[in-house]
Each structure stands twice: as structure tokens, then as C-alpha cells.
Amino acid sequence: SALTCSGSLSFEEGLELVLIRARAMQNACKDNNSTMAAILFLSDEEINTTCEDIENVVPANYNCPGQIVISGSKEGIENACVVFKEKGGKTIPLPVGGGFHSPYMKSARVELEDAVNKAKVDTPSAPIYQNYDAIGYTDTDKIRSNLINQLTSPVRWTQSVNNMIENNVKNFIECGPGRVLQGLVKKINRETNVSSL
């Protein structure tokens, strides 16, 4: 949606890429027995270090301080939840079809790459912060590669918001139903102004 709103992708091309990405991710879920869980009340560092010690589990979403989602094999996630509870965290298994934003989406990445490379991507009217590295870009080659890379890499929402704030963004507007992102932004930095459309 950011690429479409900034004039980088046409609305039609944006919808087509969303559809291709969704189908590719759904197909990837059939190839592996993976899932996700939210981990609350532990630091990013503790979760990262613990995931390194658990087979087939990786951080998948850095939502806000004290809230990270992990992806992995079903067995790996079950084991991780036990370990994180022992460390004082709260674990919430998520009702999802697979281990998104992780290496479990490798086959989806291959499917999406061809479509992204064929898409007409123009220079956006403002820097686009993508999940892959949380840095704002206007370079179309970087935007393309990040669209592909973010399928198998964690969502760096906390880092994206912090980087936007460092670049003098003061107002955050959530587009679409719900207020989840507004809540996350406030948990990252209470000084932000948040609203929704």
C-alpha cells in the first residue's frame, strides 16, 4: 500500500503483487509443517539469543519492545514456548497457516521474485521503509530487492518506527480497519501522534 500511495506502483500492479505473494506464501505453507507464536515480556536480545539455541526457530516480527513473534517448525515452536515460559515470558501460539517471515517461505520468495522483477516500479514520492531492513529508500532497485527479501526475513516494525522518528516523522496515520499499528507505535514511542483513516 505504501508503494501504491507513493506512486511507485500502480493500484492494479500493487493488487497483482499482493495476490501473487499471498498465493506463493500459501503454497509454501503446504511444503512445510511450520507455525508462529507471540512472545511477550522479554527483551529482543533475550529472544534473539534463545532462538539461536533452539533448532528451527527464528524471530519473525519485532512488533514493539516486549512483543516479538517467532516462526519455526511446529515442534520447534512448541519447544520454544516451553523455554520462553521458563524465562518468564508469556507465549501465545498463533492460528496461522505457516511460519511466515522466515526461511520457511523460501519457495514463496522464488515465486514472487519473477513477478517483482517484471513489475513497473517508479521512484516513490517519499522514502519507503520496508520490513527487510527498516531503512527508507527511494531507489527502485533496492525497493525491488527488499520486496523479495522480506518474505524470508523478520518484520522490523520497531526498527522502522524508530528510524522514521529519527528522520523527523512525527505523525503516524494507520490506514485500514483496526488500531493495532497505532498501539504498537505508541508502545515504541509515547511521544508520537497516531491516528487512523
What are these regions (language model features)?
Residues 117-197:
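Acyltransferase/transacylase module recognition
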